[in-house]
Amino acid sequence: MGANKQMNLGFLFQISGVHYGGWRYPSAQPHRATDIQYYAEIVRTAERGKLDFCFLADSIAAYEGSADQQDRSKDALMAAEPKRLLEPFTLLAALAMVTEHIGLVTTATTTYNEPYTMARLFASLDHITNGRAGWNVVTSANLAEAHNFGRDGHVEHGDRYARAEEFINVVFKLWDSIEDGAYLRDKLAGRYGLSEKIHFINHIGEHFKVRGPLNVPRPPQGHPVIVQAGSSHPGKELAARTAEVVFTAQQTLADGKAFYSDVKGRMAKYGRSSENLKVLPGVVVYVAETESEAKAKYETVSNLVPPDFGLFMLSDLLGEIDLKQFDIDGPLPEDLPEAKGSQSRREVIINLARRENLTIRQLYQRVSGASGHRSIWGTPKQIADQFEQWVYEEAADGFNILPPYLPESMNDFVNFVVPELQRRGIFRTEYEGSTLRDHLGLARPKNSVAKPS
């Protein structure tokens, strides 16, 4: 790896960890799911490790899947801890008060929200955090979300992304509708603002009609950092045009290199440099002094997932397929029905099963800890070797760390893996800037609405 090549590291914060068995792990603390001090302790640990950001994934439904699927699987659902039990904007605003440097990122869907509301929320969060906010832009494919917003089914794939593109464009205009320096607050002159620096955007499009301006000053970062996680063709196009960070699930180095090259190769037609997009594959890390001890941690937590829930979860990831009709200790059938949910994630999981000849039981044990992301175990050196190889061979610019069980696995990562990366000179030893854009090496966007001076 080149001497100046630094990797970026964030982490996904789900209550007791991303593994569905994580809440049952001996050191887990599921009783603290709504305790702000619990969240603060873990985020401060990540900040001690100089990580770029904390990511709170969000959904506007309690469970995944259709109403019928949920009704059939009530008991199975009760075997798993919910992925979230607090609304993320409120939680991140609280965490901003107990942290100084780490970025704070959350999800908001373009399918069941309005641009003005999202522009206002993220601009406010960016001010509260002093420039540390990020928006993970998603389009909703979860039927449970559709059912919470008066729909019998979700919006079709292509339509979701068309709406998302316009949605993001409107939000950008709204963030830029109040120029830097628009508010003079001149007490002597009796003039609070400059009308020439406050703009009505007057957007009229296929999906939205928005006059503006925003009633929040321009964010400290200009725009909060835009994150995107879709790996389908429309998702990669959206990322190439608008995203600054991409979360992705890639199981192999070859797949990672192909995705990296593909999504960055689409950017030039939008007038963007590939340096302005950070590709961060998700990875679940089990680290210990020996490889066998690390693997034992993986096996322990994997065996804590009840079969009924494992089948339900795998069924949802594969597109609501009834897996109970198949032998749990046999292979995944070749002729699976069409997917109803995320097509790219389904493909990752099917390829994993075929490549490693996994039974259905082995497959749900693998994905219950990662939802299609890569799981690795080993010593700090072995983990760092893999990280370094992926960045050196342009399969990643860094990683979105998925702690399997909390708080222990975050402590392990910060105490053992981070020092090894720092020793190699490929991860920072101190924060060098104050904003999330600074951490990621991203420039502050120019104002698209302001007239040239």
Swiss-Prot record:
The enzyme's E.C. designation: 1.14.14.10
The entry's keywords: Flavoprotein, FMN, Monooxygenase, Oxidoreductase
Domain of life: Bacteria
EC category name: oxidoreductase
Alphabetical list of InterPro entries matching this protein: Diverse_substr_monoxygenases, Luciferase-like_dom, Luciferase-like_sf, NTA_MOA
The keyword Metal-binding is assigned to this record: no
Gene Ontology molecular function: any one: nitrilotriacetate monooxygenase activity
Substrates-to-products reaction catalysed: nitrilotriacetate + FMNH2 + O2 = aminodiacetate + FMN + glyoxylate + H2O
A Pfam family the protein falls into: Bac_luciferase
Binding site for FMN: D58, T107, H157, Y161, S231, S232
Protein family (similarity comment): Belongs to the NtaA/SnaA/DszA monooxygenase family.
Function per UniProt: Hydroxylation of nitrilotriacetate.
PANTHER family from the UniProt entry: ALKANESULFONATE MONOOXYGENASE-RELATED (PTHR30011), C2H2 FINGER DOMAIN TRANSCRIPTION FACTOR (EUROFUNG)-RELATED (PTHR30011:SF16)
Subunit record text: Heterodimer of two subunits, A and B.
UniProt-recorded name of the protein: Nitrilotriacetate monooxygenase component A
Source species: Aminobacter aminovorans
